[in-house]
Design a protein with these regions (language model features):
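Bacterial Sec-dependent N-terminal signal peptides
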Residues: 1-27
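Boundary regions of SH3-family modules and the immediately adjacent low-complexity/disordered segments
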Residues: 20-28, 45, 61, 74-105, ...
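Short, basic/aromatic beta-hairpin or loop at an interaction surface
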Residues: 29-40, 100-113, 229-241
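Beta-loop motif signature
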Residues: 33-62, 106-143, 209
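SH3/SH3-like beta-barrel fold
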Residues: 57, 70-74, 130, 153-157, ...
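Aromatic- and glycine-rich peptidoglycan recognition patches
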Residues: 111, 119-123, 184-187, 274-277, ...
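Second-shell loop/turn segments in exported
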Residues: 120, 183-188, 208-216, 268
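Catalytic cysteine-centered active-site loop
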Residues: 208-257
């Protein structure tokens, strides 16, 4: 009996070790966001707090699951939970094909993909600015020719469904440029591009504040800043506490249009600096930011639209 117990113990150890080896060699799981936006929550529960959102076309890694929830890591990068219905899981070959395909970005605030090239047709899904879709057509790279019909362009959704969008509402998408810490003037954003970013931010004016929001349906402070840059090909980190490390530090008395301005508590008495808010400087002492809603405020206390937390301005960065 003792001998049998020893043999059984050895067998169980072998099976356990084999299982661990297989788990260690498991291929990473990837998916593409298939809805106009997905809600990424702290825990796999609808009552859990919203952390952020990810837009259609983004590639994410699946690292866990619980029932119909999937724990993912997004490109922001951000780790959180979303429902499986918002994802289209792909194997290695499918993902490579997706990444190499010709794509477009939806550049209007809101819209739809239609079954046929008509606004009277049945909708397939909704869209928000920043959504990325594959183009249907022939050829590769600069020789690619999308399928069009009148003022419409044919697109392929992550789900595999084909549909039509208004051609004026999309532009070719060739990827994003990330802004790192202290890049200096060599890779800085041009004045022309910065004016486009500011104009994009103004498209959100009046949009309600939403904690974790990253779409024209609702944005938080860093969501507004990030979305305005993303729509113009610039990829910033998700949160204000991360953005403050991008670009170059700027003196608060030398602000220029397009600088990121940060509010919070300065480092004091051994406590580290705490960043609680970010906005986009637009000149003449004014900022556009998301606080209760996307609005324009002055940092001059003598102005009628004075931002009540202007005294908490702690830093600025130029990208």
């Amino acid at each position: 009996m003792k001998r049998f117990a020893i043999i059984l113990s050895m067998l169980l150890c072998t099976i356990s070790a084999t299982g661990q080896t297989r788990a260690a060699k498991a291929e990473p799981r990837y998916a593409v966001v298939g809805l106009s936006s997905i809600y990424m929550r702290i825990a796999p529960d609808y009552e859990s707090a919203l952390e952020t959102q990810e837009l259609m076309g983004s590639v994410v890694e699946i690292i866990g699951e619980k029932s119909y929830w999937r724990e993912i890591i997004s490109p922001q990068p951000y780790k959180a939970w979303c429902t499986r219905m918002g994802l289209v899981e792909m194997n290695k070959e499918q993902l490579e094909e997706y990444q190499n395909a010709a794509k477009c970005m939806f550049i209007d605030l809101y819209g739809h993909v239609y079954e046929t090239p008509s606004c009277e047709a049945q909708t397939i899904c909704d869209l928000v600015g920043g959504d990325i879709m594959r183009l249907v057509g022939k050829g590769k790279a600069e020789n690619f020719k999308p399928v069009t019909k009148g003022s419409w362009t044919k697109v392929l959704l992550p789900s595999g469904a084909e549909g039509w969008v208004k051609s004026e509402c999309i532009k070719q998408h060739n990827g994003f440029r990330s802004i790192a810490k202290g890049e200096g003037n060599a890779d800085s954003i041009s004045d022309e591009l910065m004016e486009k970013i500011i104009a994009t931010a103004f498209k959100l004016k009046g949009v309600p504040y939403l904690w974790g929001g990253m779409t024209p349906k609702g944005v938080d402070c860093s969501g507004m800043v990030r979305w305005s840059h993303l729509m113009n090909g610039i990829l910033l980190p998700r949160n204000a506490s991360q953005m403050i490390h991008c670009g170059d530090e700027v003196s608060l008395d030398s602000l220029q249009r397009g600088d990121l301005v940060f509010f919070g508590n300065p480092a004091k008495d051994g406590k580290p600096q705490l960043v609680t808010h970010v906005g986009l400087y637009i000149g003449n002492g004014q900022i556009i930011h998301s606080s209760m809603l996307v609005r324009v405020n002055s940092m001059n206390p003598e102005e009628s639209n004075y931002y009540e937390n202007s005294h908490r301005l702690i830093a600025a960065r130029r990208l």
